[in-house]
Amino acid sequence: SWSDRLHETLTLLHAHAAAWVQIDEPKFRFSIQQNLLPNERGLYYMRLHGRNAQAWWSHARAEDRYNYLYSRDELREFADAADAVRRLVGRTYVYTNNHFSAKAVANAVVIKDLLREPIDGEYPAAFLDRYPEAAEAIRAAARARAHRVTARIP
């Protein structure tokens, strides 16, 4: 893996001003190494694939590999890392892997909540029912928006 040749990989990335993609995946003995540190000032890129170790290599459908909902505690590690590095780099991106049942959206909502970023948009009732942690973050953001609007009315 390219993470096994760390010095060579970082030299190549630096030569092209390219960011190391911080990948989260199930941890196997041959998994990509992860340190969550930025290697370039301009860009930080984190991608969360999920930790579905049971279906990672053996699955009936390709999407089964990414069928994973992170807990709030698991996401806190990534939110904390993103919060720390966004003060050091130009742009910070945290991507959650797409999954047909909107787990990526639920994970992204919780990350935004942990980062105290705005949570906008409309979410179907079925989504709110299925993902209670995301639903609580969405409802709290809506209450905060309503409070700000109410506070401005003379």
Regions found by a protein language model. Name each.
Residues 1-154:
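Residues lining hydrophobic/aromatic ligand-binding pockets adjacent to catalytic sites
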